[in-house]
UniProtKB/Swiss-Prot annotation:
Organism: Methanosarcina mazei (strain ATCC BAA-159 / DSM 3647 / Goe1 / Go1 / JCM 11833 / OCM 88)
The protein's name: Probable bifunctional tRNA threonylcarbamoyladenosine biosynthesis protein
Stated role: Required for the formation of a threonylcarbamoyl group on adenosine at position 37 (t(6)A37) in tRNAs that read codons beginning with adenine. Is a component of the KEOPS complex that is probably involved in the transfer of the threonylcarbamoyl moiety of threonylcarbamoyl-AMP (TC-AMP) to the N6 group of A37. The Kae1 domain likely plays a direct catalytic role in this reaction. The Bud32 domain probably displays kinase activity that regulates Kae1 function.
Family label: In the N-terminal section; belongs to the KAE1 / TsaD family. In the C-terminal section; belongs to the protein kinase superfamily. Tyr protein kinase family. BUD32 subfamily.
Major subcellular location class: cytoplasm
Active site: D464 (proton acceptor)
The organism's place on the tree of life at top rank: Archaea
Length: 547
């Protein structure tokens, strides 16, 4: 069978890198990295760097390929990073790709940079259908494939983890890149300093953490603050990866992106996966940062599935979303799907046996009042988290859940009745229901909207609205898992709450547009400010993540 040869060019930010690959091997790769004299990246200077070195990088690449017996005439296509990224850098690389494609008379392939990080990881590890934790300078996302697209389950609501680390490092007087310097100082720490831990469903926020860490430098050593920052931020991203595993039922985690080179982050993810019986995969460090090979290989997959673009369609997209791409190269039958299930076939477990092993807690049955079955939710320690972080959030979430679940019920939202509260354990009414992720329909989504409207009217934000946290028992819908709930009447808090649910619809369920429309109808029927909140949801969705 004839080999396919694709030349790929990466240039979204720091690295100008070009490579030639086939289905099975890397023929050659050449990289020139932009290194500013001081501070972070300057988009215009980075673009000037790429323009200065582009011709030389490609010339050297073609020379190395020729040494391996590959001529320019053997190339089948030119792939380039079309976005997301810094506009000036993207335009420079796209221009180089167009000129090369025109001169050789071969097609262009516009590659999504984020998806390229995923595909190089799958190519270079045994991963087949993973939950992907993608953490780079500008991007922090939890992603998994479903029905023709890579779906985003959660992401940063403000700044990418890598940029957050670099921002803190600059403020602390550390040279660029900040991540490796923080990792080195963290190894010399003597104690943990409490810092903000901000998770909203499967979304994250790092800006408050960075600010608090910078302020902590006034009273604590750089080593201790670096250690505390790293332990806190990494625990947050590992937790959202675990939440995605629990929600999807998948059994693999793939780490992608430049921040993934951090040894401590890898250790924490591996510990989490071992505890859940999942497999953890991470490619070699050379494939973690931005590189031409990932663009070339993803371009090859796209080329072989007929996914090329014309010169007119080769404009760059600095805000190119992962879930905007139609993934035409994956065979649907090989991917894991959320199983269909009915209340009649839903599992019924005997007392004492674990009913569910979620990201938050293990759940099992015990005898309750009047001989009825009761459900026990025990927030067990997470080995990947620092002990102080772990005990603090388990204790806080246990208290919060008991209090706000009762408050929600008083507001007319059906929730389980709490029987007993211990430090890390709740005993509550056992609802013989099914998580609606198995059977969600537009009429059911409308009922969800009605419940959330009542919740928001009472001033409560759930904090973890997913279809795993709603149970259908007969004709009645129950809202559960209030560990991340809080009182807040702001548009932003309510908007993020609904945004988390809409992300779940889009990432997990086939008919998500109909589900969103039905939810909006139900939400408007019980919440007077629904239109304002839904407008805020659109704003949140459109916020640039590449910053």
């Amino acid at each position: 069978m004839k080999k396919t040869f694709i030349l790929g060019i990466e240039g979204t930010a720091w690295n100008l890198s070009a490579a030639i690959v086939t289905e099975t091997e890397i023929i050659a790769e050449v990289t020139e990295t932009y290194k500013p004299e001081k501070g972070g990246i300057h988009p215009r200077e980075a673009a000037q760097h790429h323009a200065k070195y582009a011709a030389g990088v490609i010339k050297k690449l073609l020379a190395e390929a020729k040494q391996n017996g590959i001529e320019p005439s053997d190339l089948d296509g030119i792939a380039f990073s079309q976005g997301p990224g810094l506009g000036p850098c993207l335009r420079t690389v796209a221009t180089a790709a167009r000129m090369l494609g025109l001169s050789l008379g071969i097609p262009l392939i516009g590659v999504n940079h984020c998806i390229a990080h995923i595909e190089i990881g799958i190519w270079k590890t045994p991963a087949k259908d993973p939950v992907v934790l993608y953490v780079s300078g500008a991007n922090s996302q939890v992603i998994s494939y479903m029905e023709g697209r890579y779906r985003v389950f959660g992401e940063t609501l403000d700044i990418g983890l890598g940029n957050a680390l670099d921002k803190f490092a600059r403020g602390a007087g550390l040279p660029h890149p900040g991540g490796p310097k923080i990792e080195a100082y963290a190894k010399e720490a003597k104690r943990y300093i409490p810092l903000p831990y901000v998770i909203k469903g499967m979304d994250l926020s790092f800006s408050g953490l960075s600010t608090a860490a910078s302020e902590a430098l006034r009273k604590a050593s750089l080593e201790d603050v670096c250690y505390s920052y790293q332990e806190t931020a990494f625990a947050m991203v590992v937790e959202v990866a675990e939440r995605a595993l629990a929600h999807t039922g998948k059994k693999e985690v793939l780490l992608a992106g430049g921040v993934g080179a951090n040894t401590r982050l890898r250790e924490m993810l591996n510990e989490m996966c071992e505890a859940r019986g999942a497999k953890f995969y991470v490619p070699e460090k050379r494939f973690m940062g931005d590189n031409g090979t990932m663009i070339a290989y993803t371009g090859l997959l796209m080329y072989k599935s007929g996914n090329t673009i014309s010169l007119e369609d080769s404009r760059v997209n600095p805000s190119f979303r992962t879930d905007d791409v139609k993934v035409t190269w994956i065979k649907e039958e090989e991917m894991k799907k959320v199983p269909e299930i009915s209340p009649e076939t839903f599992f019924r477990m005997p007392p004492g046996e674990i009913l569910d092993n979620g990201a938050e807690a293990v759940v099992y049955l015990q005898e309750g009042p009047e001989g009825k079955r009761a459900l026990v939710k025990e927030r067990v320690p997470k080995a990947y988290r620092h002990k102080e972080i772990d005990e603090r959030i388990r204790r806080e979430r246990n208290r919060t859940e008991a209090r706000l679940m009762s408050e929600a019920r008083r507001a007319g939202v059906p929730t389980p009745i709490i029987y007993d509260v211990e430090e890390f354990k709740l005993k509550m009414q056992f609802i013989e229901g099914v998580p609606i992720k198995y059977l969600i329909t537009p009429p059911l989504s409308e009922k969800v909207g009605e419940l959330v409207g009542k919740l928001h009217s009472s001033g409560i934000v759930h904090g973890d609205l997913t279809t795993s946290n709603l149970l259908l028992a007969g004709e009645r819908l129950y809202l559960i898992d209030f560990g991340l709930a809080y009182f807040d009447k702001s548009l932003e808090a309510r908007g993020v709450d609904v945004h988390v649910l809409f992300q779940t619809f889009e990432s997990t369920h086939r008919n998500y547009e109909a589900l969103v429309k039905a939810f909006e109808k139900g939400y408007a029927s019980t919440f007077i400010d629904s239109e304002d909140v839904l407008r805020r949801v659109e704003e949140i969705k459109k916020r640039a993540r590449y910053a």
